[in-house]
Each structure stands twice: as C-alpha cells, then as structure tokens.
Amino acid sequence: MNAMKILSGILLAALVLGCGGCAGAPEEPVSTLLFAPGDGGSKYYRIPALVTADDGSLVAVADRRLESMGDLPNKIDLVARRSTDGGRTWSSVIPIAEHRGDCGYGDAALVSDARSGELLCIFASGRGLWESTPEAPIDINICRSGDFGQTWSAPECITPQLWGAACANPLSRGWYGAFAASGRALQLRDGTLLFVVAARTGRAAPPLVNYVCMSEDGGRSWRLLPTPVDMNGDEAKLVERADGSWLMSIRNPAKGRRKYALSADRGATWSEPQRWEDMPSPACNGDIVRYTLRVEGARRNRMLHSIPLDSVERRNVSVLLSYDEGCTWPVRRSVWSGDAGYSSLTVLPDGDIGLLTEVGNWERGFEIYFTRLTPEWLTRGEDDGR
C-alpha cells in the first residue's frame, strides 16, 4: 500500500513537472495576412512598412500596385491598416496617398515623432528613379497623422529642400533623382529625425550613393548632410547606438553580405563600409531597429535586424538580435523559410516584436503578413528581452 502511494506520488510529480515544462515553452509566432493580390481591386501589393504609434497602436503600410508589380512610374497607392490590440486584429484599409492619373505614390518609410505624437510617412511619387531628371525629378513627399494613423494629411512635396533643379543646394541640384529607403525612418533620442536616400547623382544608372536627410523641427524642414556614406549602396537604414553614434545598414547591390558604416560625429564623416560576415543577404531591403537600452532600464543593450538570410535568393526572412550594438548578430531565427523579400520591424509596447513581410516572389506575386513574435521564441528561451 505504501509502495503504491509512493509510486502514485512519483507519477503525479512527473506529470506536474511535464505540464510545467509545456507551459514554459516560448509562444510560437502568430502571422496575420494583411494585404493580398485582389484586395481592393489591386493586382499586386509590395513594400511593407511598420511602426508603433505613440498610443501603442500598430500601423502597417504597403504599396497597392494596381496594374503592375513594378516600381514608379505606375498606378500605385499607399494604404495602411491599424491594430489597437498588438496585431491580433486589424482595421479596414486606410488610404494615405492615392494615385492621380499616372502619378503614383510608393516606397513608404515610417517614423513616430515622440515629441509631437505625430506619425510621418515619407515616400516617393511621380516619375520613376530611372526616368527622373534634375528638371523633372522623382519627388519625395510627407504625409502626417495626428491621430495615430486613423487619418492622414495631403502629401507635402519636400523635393526642393533636398535635390533637383529647384533646390538651392549645389551638391544635389544636379542630381537625377533619389528615393528614401522604405521601412523605418529614425528618431534620435534628442528628437532629430533622419532617413537615408539612395541617390542617382548623374545621368548614368547604378551605382547609387547613400546620403542622410535630417530634420530638427519635427519634419517641417529638411536638409541633406553633405557626406556620402557609400558610393555603391542602395536602400539603407539607420539606428542610434548606445553611445550616440550612428550605425547604417546598407543593401549590398553585389549580393553576398550586408554592408554597414559608422559615424561618430552626427553624420559629418563616415567609416568605410564593411561587410557583416555573419549576415548573408541577396541584395534586398530589410530593417534595423533599437530593441532595448540599459539607460532606459533594460538589463542589456539590444538591436534587431530583419533580412532574408540567403546570399543569393530572396527567401528565409529572419529576425536577428545583437548584444554588442550591431558588431555581431549571434541570435537569429527564420520566420519565413520560403520565398520572401522586403520586411519591416517594430517593437510592441509589451516588448514583443512585430514583423511585416512581403511573402512570395515575382512570378506569383506577394502577400504581406504581420507576424508577432516574442523575445523568448527568438532566443529559444534564453532571453526575455527585459
């Protein structure tokens, strides 16, 4: 009888421990389809951009490419969907900028201004990059939202502040065109707003050159920083390091490995671009964002990067984690193992991670999914992100 009680106790303890282990397993990522071919009468969708608004809501933006999968000049609208519950449910489609005739709008970069609470959407319009000239350039515009993405202002053209024949800056007056890298723009801790353009500085096609655009008044006025970052770059993103220096992650047109450069003097000078040997990349856009900072109460400084981790093909979109301010990326997990391209990242108010990804390829088209994942899942239970 006593032996039976002991055996029953052992079995019960084993069951309790087993259930406890199951309960402690990291939550698996959950993906939601937000934009798909055929939605809204559009044949195609591309170019994800994602941001967390000041009230904690999520805003996901995409190009609604009505007739062609190609870039500008085409009939393209910028559209958004919002979530107020961490990405579990989403609003109906919200227009940001809709094409007029053959003038389309595309390639959105998003940033939330912590000073004003406004959302800024920065994007291209009109002529395509390769059709652009100094006299008739591809335009860059801003739309603003003062209600966390529910409504948006009319597009404001800021091209004359930055490039083209109407610009007073002798450096960029003769440029043939430029566009902001889609995904995330950046607000520094002092409130300064930044985004990176890929500039076509002469009549010839590539290479493109990366330059930083800066605003110190909430995006009301902009200026071009004079130092080129990469003379053979493309879509590039910025993040502020813990020491205040800037790290730029650069699409490598040669494929192989992602490139980066550093500035310790607010963009006045830049290091020579180097390759992240631990980050293969197939000449594709991705995102880099700050995750946590020790000065804000976290145990560690952390950055996140999303990119297709493949040196040749656009597939295997993964999220990577750095503990040394972007020097190395030792933690990585694949979110979309098949064909997938551009992606955008944001941090949710509870510390979970949001990823917006175009899933598919040029043959069958792209669907755009939002994925919510936890730091525990990303690190296989090693880090809770606090």
Where in the sequence are the language-model features?
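Positively charged n-region of N-terminal signal peptides that target proteins for export
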Residues: M1-I6
